[in-house]
Amino acid sequence: MNRFFSLAIFILSSFVLLNVAFAQDETHGAFDVVYNQDTFTDENRSFILTMPTDFRSGWSEDNLGFSMKCLADGLNVLVIWGKFFGGDRDDRVAVTYRLDDRPSPGPMRWTMLPSSEAAWMPMHLVNDFVAEARTARTLALRVTDPLDGETITNTFSLEGFGTALDRIIPCR
């Protein structure tokens, strides 16, 4: 869990998660599971997180993180990076993904979080993505900042994805 500690803290702070009742960690394949429950509402705010397959040690601004997190609107798909991206006029970045050797659906606009160092997938795409990811072995992610064209690309192992995800859903 040490290799994910700083990224997990970043995700938690990005969502301004106050009043966390408990946090307990476990690992399934390439994924860490972090359990969080709001003290007052009992809402599930748990998440799973993985780092790129070529991740060595220490977080760098040239790495992406891949996460799925329970929020008030349900299960969210997130990509995290370690530097400021300007985004477009709607605070979005271009995200392209590819599962195994399947064709990529092409670049999509994902809305950035207020930190400008993470973005989430549009909710109407999440269920199809999850269904496809459950049967895949790898995920390639590319994030491009439309402001200046800066790009970060990483590949992730999806080993343990289904098991880890099943540990945090349903998101209630």
List the model feature ranges, each with a label.
Residues A8-L17:
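Bacterial N-terminal signal peptides
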Residues F22-R172:
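A generic "folded-domain core" signal
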Residues M1-A8:
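Bacterial N-terminal signal peptides that target proteins for export
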Residues F5, A21-F22:
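Generic extreme N-terminus detector
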